[in-house]
Structures are given as structure tokens and as C-alpha cells.
Amino acid sequence: MESEMLQSPLMGLGEEDEADLTDWNLPLAFMKKRHCEKIEGSKSLAQSWRMKDRMKTVSVALVLCLNVGVDPPDVVKTTPCARLECWIDPLSMGPQKALETIGANLQKQYENWQPRARYKQSLDPTVDEVKKLCTSLRRNAKEERVLFHYNGHGVPRPTVNGEVWVFNKNYTQYIPLSIYDLQTWMGSPSIFVYDCSNAGLIVKSFKQFALQREQELEVAAINPNHPLAQMPLPPSMKNCIQLAACEAHELLPMIPDLPADLFTSCLTTPIKIALRWFCMQKCVSLVPGVTLDLIEKIPGRLNDRRTPLGELNWIFTAITDTIAWNVLPRDLFQKLFRQDLLVASLFRNFLLAERIMRSYNCTPVSSPRLPPTYMHAMWQAWDLAVDICLSQLPTIIEEGTAFRHSPFFAEQLTAFQVWLTMGVENRSPPEQLPIVLQVLLSQVHRLRALDLLGRFLDLGPWAVSLALSVGIFPYVLKLLQSSARELRPLLVFIWAKILAVDSSCQADLVKDNGHKYFLSVLADPYMPAEHRTMTAFILAVIVNSYTTGQEACLQGNLIAICLEQLSDPHPLLRQWVAICLGRIWQNFDSARWCGVRDSAHEKLYSLLSDPIPEVRCAAVFALGTFVGNSAERTDHSTTIDHNVAMMLAQLINDGSPMVRKELVVALSHLVVQYESNFCTVALQFMEEEKNYPLPSPAATEGGSLTPVRDSPCTPRLRSVSSYGNIRAVTTARNLNKSLQNLSLTEESGSSVAFSPGNLSTSSSASSTLGSPENEEYILSFETIDKMRRVSSYSALNSLIGVSFNSVYTQIWRVLLHLAADPYPDVSDLAMKVLNSIAYKATVNARPQRILDTSSLTQSAPASPTNKGMHMHQVGGSPPASSTSSCSLTNDVAKQTVSRDLPSSRPGTAGPTGAQYTPHSHQFPRTRKMFDKGPDQTTDDADDAAGHKSFICASMQTGFCDWSARYFAQAVMKIPEEHDLESQIRKEREWRFLRNTRVRKQAQQVIQKGITRLDDQIFLNRNPGVPSVVKFHPFTPCIAVADKDSICFWDWEKGEKLDYFHNGNPRYTRVTAMEYLNGQDCSLLLTATDDGAIRVWKNFADLEKNPEMVTAWQGLSDMLPTTRGAGMVVDWEQETGLLMSSGDVRIVRIWDTDRETKVQDIPTGADSCVTSLSCDSHRSLIVAGLGDGSIRVYDRRMALSECRVMTYREHTAWVVKAYLQKHPEGHIVSVSVNGDVRFFDPRMPESVNVMQIVKGLTALDIHPQANLIACGSMNQFTAIYNGNGELINNIKYYDGFMGQRVGAISCLAFHPHWPHLAVGSNDYYISVYSVEKRVR
């Protein structure tokens, strides 16, 4: 019968596939993004897309040197020859009229691209006329761009000396015009177009002269006495652009079917010349009936996209833009295609000129030079579009049939869609992105284009950056003017992506009234919650630290809109609505008072108990900024601040460190507002701390909690350098053996053997005491911790009176508590706040200076961290606590300390003579009382002035910026853990297969029967006395806790894997450990007897350092005891619930998913809880108590009825109470007297009893095998089967010449294998198993 009671199946996982399925279905604890990521924002995007020097071409000089009817002497023209200039035959009319008509036509052609520019023609000019024209245009243009168009078809070719030709007044001579002079007149920025043979020569000469100018400028700058420095400085030509029709050695084509100014035609009438050139190609024969005359009759206008001609122009723009974006470097693309509308048009058309003119062995030249584009694949798409258009012309013109629109844009969007569906890893960006931009304003393609654009932006910040660089911003900004409801979700998504990467767009939105669009979306109850969430984020960005945005959104009724959605079931929406509220009234008093009128703060209170930690954190942020306004105070506002503060104070023991960090920041706002009040409270507290003795620890006798006197063995509080600065993380994987025997000298001069407690954690900790700006704390951790513990005793209240219970007093208590928080980031922030007030209070005390001192206080610096010399100090090892309580004049001089070894502290130092000492150097680091400080002559007002700014500047959590990262990341992509082909998924599969193998093999060994368990398979000396030991369920790793550190051993290889400090204070000890997510990504939970819980990752990892995932105060008001249960826990992986109890009167249940307390079940006893065991299937909790009782609770029932059974058969301390996991599991309990009792939870009495050895110190029950192991103070371990029969004793270590084992301090069975780990007071840890032949 007993055997049946102890024997349990594989926790209901008898079949391999069932067990494997359970692994997949088990929830993972502390694996959310808030646990895996650092709480900080993304790195800000360099705004390369936003043009800082956007320009306009405001003036255009059209210089035509045609001399109609007279050919220049150095050009021999063919017969027939190209004659058309600006599509005018100059011989069809008189020379003068022809010249004027050509000039007028050229101006019209340019006006199509820039109608607002100022145009000036200079027809067959002289040098003076050109000079006058250029200087006039430059003078009027100021800093804007001027265009100089030069047609030199009627004059000789440019010279190698850098000259072009114009005329004399009588047209009897060609006069040279130096490019150097032209540069001087035109200035910069300018763009030059040269349409003449050998035009490349001009470009070369231009560059040479520009370089010469730069050298002259440099000489004048270096030597003011140089003759060049006395002359007017020449303008720099750096910002000049040139377009030339051909290379330096080339002539313009003279084919009669082409215009003579082919280059100009390409630049100014691209569609006309492109169609004409297309008709001259052989491929046009495939389209019958198309002639040069027919293409002149293409219906429509260039600027009307609905017509054939307009559609062709639109397609041409899209294609040339796309070619440029795909070929040009990004910065060059921005400069040439996005900076200036006219320049962009000319360069798009220049790509056509290159394609057409290269077919006639003529190569257009540009400066800056472009990569070749004439062979780009997109030209084929252009040819197809032209082909489709021209093929319709005969029927359209002759028969009047309707025009069929080109499928070009639809096909390009499909190509873009294909690129998106094929994956983006290691691929170049989609070349169709500029085309998507082109169709955003087209009603036909807009919806599809926005959808595809959104999917592209969802790929990540790089995609957003790419889209912004291509010029998407003005288009999506303009679309906010649309009232189409179907666009709302798409636009909201796109804008959320943009603002998540570049928040500076907030100003553009407000300027264009874009915020009104999002206000209407957020107020729309028919919008899905996901899109309202994005809208709330967008508005939160608009009002973030931007007064104009705050004012605009306040007028738009944002506060009321947000308040209506605080109770929305969508948690992300609740989170961002709260953040949005917090930002709109941050440093904006009008919004705060609007919030007061709407009772916003009271409506936010409900979110403080939200099940989602991020929502609670957002609510704390919003309430923190609500009380953080620096406007003038009234009684009403003060009352509101007090109410908010007291509501926030309830989160002091929230399970999420993220929430508690935000709580510190919120309370710091209150501290800044009511600084003088807090200074008074601080002085009051410190005075009481000095006079009031700390209550003594309690001792447990017979399982009851009773106070005892303080004794010399009571652990001292640790020094300031060890707490609140847990930052040092070493790179060494193992503890250096040379440090094992290293002696460190304490202040008393005694030598102590190395232990984790002798190492300081942070070389950045305070070495002297001064202003908070240097992180040099006036209040040590010891002082703060004592203040916290003293203030928790009600007797103190009567000493100080009613004022002690004021709001400021309560908030000070909260900050004291948070300064001792187990999570270092929280305690660091709280220490900063407390010390800021302490610093301010000492400055206000106006001390007098000390003159006659033989030695001055300068505390020894914190022990430096040597990365290669000691164990991981992730949690921070406390150094030997200081015993000094020096007076202000009995001090030691600062000693130079080696960086290689922890510092030693001499007790005395030579006198330094009377001198002035900095204020911050005259305080003992660990002084007992909050003193007003030594006197000094320097004025502290300057230091005090920066006090508020210190708190405000340093009080940042990064929560809001971190939350915004969600919108910058892919939300449409399948999470990697759900992707069947991902690395993470494969690793999980491997782990679950391993788990199945371990379960199967272990069960096979157990089924063979266990007759002995004394084969020692592992033995090693632990760095500290083992207090808790825990097997990993599936890897050969065992965790061994000593008082304040954790060591990991590989029990198969016999190697030490890791050793790090847990971070708990010196006067506390680790009393429990649990592996979380043991089946997958394992974490280690540690519990200490001060009620703190810490969770670690990356332990026993050769590539990473241990890292604290989270920490919180699992139990508050734990009574300090010299002998007690400490903290006991039990973990339910299936539900993610953590049961905790110990030296308290309750069993507290934590939901690790929500990181919040679920319930407190009263134990109904006056003694401590010594053991906990739970069963998720029946919701039962079994507690063993120090008074010998076993109590069963059903957590589904009301608190007054949940204790369903109490067994009082044990008469002494219960060592173990175990609830078997299978559905009909029994309760097995053992007391220190060795009586093992079996209970059926349905029965009022035990169903069986057996007696084992007395004087137990540790006991465990194997969850699978029929085994009980117990350890004794009498230096042996006994193993029993379920019938109470002794299997074997273990009294001696193997291979130690019969050395006797020490007193057993802890032991534990492996969850699956028949392995037993035993820790003893002689520092040794050993693992025993069945005989080798059985294994």
C-alpha cells in the first residue's frame, strides 16, 4: 500500500508522444520581450532622407548663338542635314524671326518644367550682354539656383583653352567668352546646359577653373598678406551642375530625321523625341500604320494622366526615376532627383538623352558624372508601354475607339508584390519602389499601392529609411487630406511605421494639420483596436516633447478621446492611450488642468492593477508626468498630487521591475515639486535612525516566531559600494583558483579567507561622498536600509507624531523600500532620488569649515573589479562591511589603490596638515547619522542649482521609447519561434527530443528496480557551504546555492561551469531555488529569506555571462530570524504560478505571466511555513509548518474557506510536505523526528506512518521512483524505499581514505534519473546513483 502511495507515474506523461506534446504546450515564464530586451529605444535614424538644403531654380538664362543662315567655319554639315531647333525649321522664315521664334519656343519648353522661374533670353549676344544677363540673374536669385542654357550651333566649337564663342555687335566676328568669366558672373549654385559639338571640353575646362578657384580661396585663407587675399574672393563652384550634349571629341549627330538640337529636345520635350526615335527603330515595323505624322496626333495633354499622352509622360517619369534610384548612389540621387524640381526633371530627361544619343555614337556628359543607364532593363518596360500606346493609335484616330490604359503600373505593382512574397534576406531592395511612390496619388492604384507600401515598411527600419529616401514622405502627407475611409487603416499603419523610425516628422504633421486626421481615427469606434492603437502611438509621438503638437492635440480634444478608451479590452491600446495622456500633459499645465477637469488621474487608477505589466507601467508614467508639472502650485493641485502619490505608492511591491522603475521616476517628479518638504522628512528620519535601535532578529523555537536579543553573530549590513551599483560583470568563466586562498585585509586588520562577500561589486561606486552628479552618495545603503527597517516599526510613529504619517513621510518610506529593491536598476534610481534630497538638505544646512584637523575624511574607494581575476559578479558581491563610525575629524587619508587586486584599508594614515578639503570629501562613507556636514567656505549654491536638473536628467527608464520599438519591428511576419524552418524552432525541437530521451532512459532504469543508491558519480568542493541544491531536469547540470552565491557543476564531467553572486544583502541567505522553463529555455529562480526573488538566465553558458532577468519582493514583512524556514517556494510550470511562503502568516501566489500577486492565502497558524507543494490539476496547495501541522488549501475557494484540511499528527518541525502529482496523489510529509506520514486529502487522518532516522536536516522524495532520502546532522545520508525499508546509508566519501561526510546541509533527487545530490557543511557536494550495471 505504501509502495502505491509513493509510486507515481510520469506526472501523467506516460507515453513518449504525450510527454513531447506537453513540452510544446507548456507556457514559458519570463520570456516576453520585456525580459529578453534591454528597456531602451531604438537608435535614432540619421535623417539622410530629409533634404537640408532644398533649392529652387528661380532664374533661367537662355543664350542662343545660332546666326541663322550662316554656318560656322569649323563645321562641315551633311546634305541633307538636321535643321530643326526647338522643333522650328529656321530656314522656313526670316533669320531674325526664326531666332526669336526659336527663343520663345525654348522658353515655353522650359516653362513646362518650371513655370514660376524668371526667364531671360539672349539671342546671338555679345560678351557684355552675357555678362549683364548673368550678373543680373545672380543678383536677383541670391542663394537660389540659376540655369544657364547655351546653344552654340551657329558659332565655332569650344576651345581647349576653356572658351565658348559669342558675337561682336555687328556680327562680323566670333568673340571668345572665357568659362572662367562665366563662372564669376553666374556664381553658385548654378546649372549649365551646353548644346554644341565638343561640349565635353567645356565641362573639363569648367572643372579646371573651379579647382583653380578653390586653390585661390585656400591661399587667401592661409595667408592674409598674399596678393590674392587683397582681391575680391572668387565664388566657389562646388555646388554647380553641368549637362553637355557630347564628349570633348564628339560632334553632334546630323541625321535629317532628327532635330539639330537633339540634346535640348531630350531635355525639354522628352516624350515627343522619344516617340519620334521609337518610330525610327526597326521594331516599329511590328506595329503597322504608325508614322511620324501619326505620333503628332496622339490625343491628350502631358499633364493629364487620364489621356494617352499624359499616361505616357507619367510612365516615363516613373521609369526614369526608378532607373536613377536603382543606379545612382543614394546621396547623389537625393541631390539630383529630390533637391530641385527643375534639376530633377532635367536629369530624368538626361537619362533619355543618353539612351537616344548613344545610338548615334554620341555620349552626353554630366557633372557630377552618372553611371551608365542606357542599357537598364526598365527601358524595355518603356518600349513596351510605347508599343501598346502606338498600336492603338490607328483605331483611336480613324475609328474613334476608346483608349485602353497601359497595364504598366499594375504589372510593376505585381512585380513589387512578388518581391515581398519571396523573402528579403540578403537581397537588394525592390527596384519598383519609386513606381509605388508614383501611383500613391492615383485613385486607380492607390489602395493596392498603400497596401504594398505598408507591407514593405513592415520589414523594418531599413525599409522605412529606404522609402523615405526615395521621397515617399510628401505623398503620404498629402494623402491625409483624403476623406476615404478605406484608406484609414493603411495610412495609419504607414504613419506608425514612419514615426517609429523618425519621430521628427511630428512637426510636419502638425504644420499640415495631419494630427486632425489621426484624432478622428482614434475617436472612430468602428476602427479596429489594432489601428486605434497605432493611432494612439502616432498621437503620442506628435505630442512628445513638442509644445506645438501638445497645444494642437489639446484643442482637438485628445484627452477626452483617450480617456474613453482606457478600458478597452485590447491591452496595447490601453498602454498607448495612457502613454499618450502622459505625454500630452508633460510640462504642459493647460493639458494637466484639462485632465483634472475630466478626472483623468482617477480614471487612470484602474490601470494600476491591470493584468498586463506594460499597461501598469504606462499608467504609472502618465500619473508621474501628471504630478510632474512645474507650474505654480495651489491647494487644489497639491491635494491632487498627494492623492496620486498615495495611489502610486501601492505599487511598491509590484512584480515587474519595469513598473517599479517607472514608479521611482514618477515619485521623483513629486520629490522635485515638493523638495523642501522632503528635505524636512529626510532630516527627521535620519535623526530617528540615529537615536532608535534597530529591532533584533527573531528566533524560532518550536516553530513559533519570537523576538530575541541582538547578538554578536547577527550579520552586519553591507557597505554602500556593494548595493545599488550591481553592475560589474566579469568575462572570466570560472573562479580563478589562485583567489581561492587569497587573504583580504579588513579595516580591523584581520585577515579573512576569500569568499564572495569579500569582493566589491563596482569600481564605479562611490569612493567619496558628494554631489549626486558624480554618483557619489551621501546616504550609504546601510543608512538607507536601517532607515527603511526602523520606519517599518509602529513604535516609531508615536515618537514623531502625526506628521510622520504625512504623504511626504509615506512616499519617503516607499523610496527607502525601493532603494533596497532586489532589482539593481530600481534600487539605483531610488538611491539617486534619496541622495539628491540628502545633498540638497546638506547644502541648505550652510555648514562652517573645519581648520584644525590632523587628518581628513576620505573613504577608501570601492574595490576595483578585475575582469580576469574572479567569479561572475552579476549580482554584486558585498565587500566586508565597514565597522567605522568615525567622527568628522577622526578620519583617514585617501590611499592609492592598485587596480589589480581588491583594495586593502589601513586603519591609520599620516597627517596631511591643516587645509581646506572639498565638501564631498569630509563625510565618512558609511556614517551612521544624517549630518549637516562639515563647514566650508565655498558657496554651494551653484551645486544646488543643478539639483532639480540632476533628478530630471537622470530619471529616465526608456520605457516609452522601448514600447515604440514594437511599431518599428515587423508585425506581419510570422514570429521566428512559430516559423517551422527557423533556427529557434529547430533548437526547440532538439531540446524536446532530448527531454523525451531523458524521460525514457530514466524510466527504464527505475523500472529495473533500485536496490542501492550509493555509487558516487560526482564529488567536488563547492566554493561555499551548500544550502540548496537543485538538479536541472534534462541537462547534466546541478545548481548549488550557498549563502549568497550560486555555483553550477556538470555532474557528468565533474567540471565547474559557473559561479556568480546572487545579489542578496549580507544579512540574508538563499533558501530556495527552482528551474523555470526546464523543458526549454531554462531560467533559475532564487529566493532569499528577506522575501526577495531573483530570476537568472545565461547561467552555465560558456559564451554569455549570467544576467538577471527579473527580481521582485515575493514576500514583504519577512521577520528576520536566526533560525527559520526563510522563504520556501513551489513552481507550477503548467500554469505559470509561483507559490511562496516562509517566515510569514500567508501563502502568496504570484502569476508570473502577469507579474502580479494573485492571492494571499492566510495560513491560520502562528508558525512559519517550512515546505510547500502544489498540484495544478486539483488547485491544491499543501503546506508543512514549523509547529508540525500539515495544512491543505484549495485556492479556488474564498479566503475564509480555502483551508480544507489540517493534519496535526507531527509534533515537530515539518522538513518536507510533498503532494504527489498524479490525479490520485497522496500527501507525504516528514518531520525532524523522522516520522513519515501518508495522507489522503479526502481523509481526516493519515493512512499510513513509518519511522526513519531522527534528527533530520534535509529530506527529499523522488517524484518518479519509490525513494526517500534524508540527511542528518550526524554526518550521514539514508535512503529508504516506499515501504520504509532502509536501502543504504552513505557515511563516507569514495576515494578519500574513508573520510567521513560532513553534516548534511541539503539534498535533492533528480526529477527523472535515480540520482541524489547531497551537500554538506564541509563544503562538499556529491551525487550518488544506482550501480553502474543498472545504469
From Swiss-Prot:
Phenotype of the disrupted gene, per the record: Early embryonic lethality. Conditional deletion in osteoclasts leads to an increase in bone mass with decreased bone resorption due to impaired osteoclast differentiation. Conditional deletion in odontoblasts leads to a dentinogenesis imperfecta phenotype, characterized by smaller tooth volume, a thinner dentin layer and a larger pulp chamber. Conditional knockout mice in excitatory neurons do not show any prosocial effects of lysergic acid diethylamide (LSD) unlike control mice.
Pfam families, per the entry: HEAT, Raptor_N, WD40
GO MF annotations in UniProt: enzyme-substrate adaptor activity; protein-macromolecule adaptor activity; small GTPase binding
Modified residues (Phosphoserine): 44, 122, 696, 719, 721-722, 738, 791-792, 836, 855, 859, 863, 877, 982
Keywords attached to this entry: Acetylation, Cytoplasm, Glycoprotein, Isopeptide bond, Lysosome, Phosphoprotein, Repeat, Ubl conjugation, WD repeat
InterPro entries, sorted: ARM-like, ARM-type_fold, HEAT, Raptor, Raptor_N, WD40/YVTN_repeat-like_dom_sf, WD40_repeat_dom_sf, WD40_rpt
Post-translational modification: Insulin-stimulated phosphorylation at Ser-863 by MTOR and MAPK8 regulates mTORC1 activity. Phosphorylated at Ser-863 by NLK in response to stress, disrupting the interaction with small GTPases Rag (RagA/RRAGA, RagB/RRAGB, RagC/RRAGC and/or RagD/RRAGD), thereby preventing lysosome recruitment and activation of the mTORC1 complex. Osmotic stress also induces phosphorylation at Ser-696, Thr-706 and Ser-863 by MAPK8. Ser-863 phosphorylation is required for phosphorylation at Ser-855 and Ser-859. O-GlcNAcylated by OGT upon glucose sufficiency, promoting interaction with small GTPases Rag (RagA/RRAGA, RagB/RRAGB, RagC/RRAGC and/or RagD/RRAGD) and subsequent recruitment of mTORC1 to lysosomal membranes, leading to activation of the mTORC1 complex. Phosphorylation at Ser-722 and Ser-792 by AMPK in response to glucose starvation inhibits O-GlcNAcylation.
Claim: Cytoplasm is one of the keywords in the record: yes
Residue stretches of each WD repeat: 1020-1061, 1065-1106, 1121-1160, 1164-1203, 1209-1249, 1251-1291, 1299-1335
Residues modified by glycosylation: 700
UniProt keyword Transmembrane present: no
Main localization, broad class: cytoplasm
Modified residues (N6-acetyllysine): 1097
Gene Ontology CC, one term: cytoplasm
Quaternary structure (record): Part of the mechanistic target of rapamycin complex 1 (mTORC1) which contains MTOR, MLST8 and RPTOR. mTORC1 associates with AKT1S1/PRAS40, which inhibits its activity. mTORC1 associates with DEPTOR, which regulates its activity. mTORC1 binds to and is inhibited by FKBP12-rapamycin. Forms a complex with MTOR under both leucine-rich and -poor conditions. Interacts with (via TOS motifs) EIF4EBP1 and RPS6KB1; interaction is independent of its association with MTOR.
Job description of the protein: Component of the mechanistic target of rapamycin complex 1 (mTORC1), an evolutionarily conserved central nutrient sensor that stimulates anabolic reactions and macromolecule biosynthesis to promote cellular biomass generation and growth. In response to nutrients, growth factors or amino acids, mTORC1 is recruited to the lysosome membrane and promotes protein, lipid and nucleotide synthesis by phosphorylating several substrates, such as ribosomal protein S6 kinase (RPS6KB1 and RPS6KB2) and EIF4EBP1 (4E-BP1).
PANTHER family in the record: REGULATORY-ASSOCIATED PROTEIN OF MTOR
Protein name per its UniProtKB record: Regulatory-associated protein of mTOR
